[in-house]
Curated annotation (Swiss-Prot):
This is Maturase K. Pfam families: Intron_maturas2, MatK_N. The gene is matK. Usually encoded in the trnK tRNA gene intron. Probably assists in splicing its own and other chloroplast group II introns. The keyword Phosphoprotein does not apply. It comes from Gagea lutea. It is found in: Plastid, Chloroplast.
Length: 516
């Protein structure tokens, strides 16, 4: 970052500095393939077919020499629209490698103007760095504390898909370098054309990871603009109070700091996910991926105003026609909504309180609002069906594509899926429904092993004994007893009713991701 600051301090004239010459600097690619400026754990290692996972200095120098050629980017543009796979396999992998290196290096460069804001910000030291904010489960205690006191809730779908040119226009305010913006357009259209090409060529899947880092950055920029109206209107509604605001970026992760706004960041490896929570006595806003929840204690009319503001803002500011059905307003007590893989609702638990005054006693009936989260069994079975673990009705079937693996690998893959689902749904208030999911995975694993050994699942289980696949039935309290063997004062009876929110979940299982 100090090298970036020196680059921008060399010339004090008002002339606009260009970002694209940084593509010819070797340290840009070192940063791009060193898991980011701060060594973030959220970037997956990038794999290239035919090359090592890390970019060597020789390859970087070779790339820079090719970029000095005047026709390099023109060559990339022409090649992106042609099929160069027939008889040119080695050439294709080499060309794809260089193209992806440029994309990753360019991703670092476009983040520089935003990163410099963070470095120069006087509030840099006040940015929260709590590790448990990275957990996806960290939002549920917040919902338990806030939603039980609210009246109305609105489910929001962030407008999509977005036109590629709008993504470029969003960055024009901070990046006024025209050549860099043109290069950004090139990468966007190149990836768009390649995605349409891959629909007819499913065997070529290496492009699915190309420009991931760049699109994470663009996605955050786009969502930041979509949610800008919420911040703006909240400031206007509190104009009588003293507020201080600051918006800055640490790499591609947005932070915001306001007196009445608290922003929580959540990430995931397969796709960048940002989660915001607006703390306000009358309104709460939470978003995960492209779905958001807006809840308020106010009347239906107030919620309808927010709906009107958001729809018109998206329509006129982002040039995106957002249909009204993307926002539903419902009473919170009579409404269940899917959010982050859970079916959430607010229930009323009736209770009777006996009150005695002198010689008179009477019973007061009251209701306590409680935020409840349960496992959506039917959608989860649908996800298992799409992954070929069972039929649509939930009947376990074998996994033919895994039948060629070793027995250990088959059991290990099924075991990881089962443990991840059990760990993620540890916050459910009714865990009995999770047993059905475990049963499906256990029988699917047994039938996959039986398919490999040309036997039946029943004969396989009888021959190997009941201890087979016992890891599928490891409960959450057993895991806790391993972690805290001496601090547990009593066994966790009725664990199917206990909700356990974990602070180490940074990735959502793909099966859960389909029902979010």
């Amino acid at each position: 970052m100090e090298e970036f600051q020196e680059y921008f301090k060399k010339d004090k004239s008002p002339q606009q500095h260009f970002l694209y010459p940084l593509l010819l600097q070797e340290y840009i690619y070192t940063l791009a393939y060193d898991d980011g400026l701060n060594g973030s754990i959220f970037y997956e290692p990038i794999e290239f077919m035919g090359y090592d996972n890390k970019s060597s200095l020789v390859l970087v120098k070779r790339l820079i020499i090719r970029m000095y050629q005047q026709n390099f980017f023109i060559y990339l543009v022409n090649d992106s629209n042609q099929n160069r796979f027939r008889g040119h396999t080695n050439y294709f992998y080499s060309h794809f490698f260089y193209s992806q290196m440029v994309s990753e290096g360019f991703s670092v460069i476009v983040e520089i103007p935003f990163s410099l804001r963070l470095v120069s910000s006087p509030e840099e030291k006040e940015i929260p760095k709590s590790q448990n904010l990275r957990s996806i489960h960290s939002i549920f205690p917040f919902l338990e504390d806030k939603l039980s006191h609210l009246n109305n809730v609105s489910x929001i779908l962030i407008p999509h898909p977005i036109h590629l040119e709008i993504l470029v226009q969003i960055l024009q305010c901070x990046i006024q370098d025209v050549p860099s913006l043109h290069l950004l357009r090139f990468f966007l259209h190149k990836s768009h054309n390649m995605n349409s090409f891959l629909k007819n060529n499913k065997t070529i899947h290496v492009f699915s990871k190309e420009t991931k880092r760049l699109f994470w950055f663009l996605y955050n920029s786009y969502v930041y603009e979509c949610e800008f109206l919420l911040v703006f209107l909240r400031k206007q509604s509190c104009y009588l109070r003293s507020t201080s605001s600051g918006a800055f970026l640490e790499r591609s992760y947005f932070y915001g700091k306001m007196e009445h706004i608290h922003i929580i960041i959540v990430y995931c490896n397969n796709f960048h996910k940002t989660l915001w929570s607006i703390k306000d006595p009358f309104m709460q806003y939470v978003r995960y991926q492209g779905k958001a929840i807006l809840a308020s204690r106010g009347a239906y009319l107030m919620m309808n105003k927010w709906r009107y503001y958001l729809l018109n803002f998206w329509q006129y500011y982002l040039n995106f026609w957002s249909q009204p059905y993307r926002m539903h307003i419902n009473p919170l007590l009579n409404y269940s909504f899917y959010f982050m893989g859970y079916l959430s609702s607010v229930l009323i638990n009736p209770s009777a309180v006996k009150n005695q005054m002198l010689e008179n006693s009477f019973i007061i009936d009251t209701g306590i609002h409680k935020f409840d989260t349960i496992i959506p069994v039917i959608p989860l079975i649908g996800s298992l069906s799409k992954a070929k673990f069972c039929t649509v009705s939930g009947h376990p079937i074998s996994k033919p594509v895994w039948a060629d693996l070793s027995d250990f690998d088959i059991i290990d893959r099924f075991g990881k899926i089962c443990r991840n689902l059990s760990h993620y749904y540890s916050g459910s208030s009714k865990k009995q429904s999770l047993y059905r999911i475990k049963y499906i995975l256990r029988l699917s694993c047994a039938r996959t092993l039986a398919r490999k050994h040309k036997s039946t699942a029943r004969a396989l289980l009888q021959r190997l004994g009941s201890g087979l696949l016992e890891e599928f039935f490891m409960e959450e309290e057993q895991v806790l007893s391993f972690i805290f063997p001496k601090t547990t004062l009593f066994p966790l009876h009725g664990s199917h009713r206990e909700r356990i929110w974990s602070l180490d979940i940074i990735r959502v299982n793909d099966l859960v991701n389909q029902i979010i």
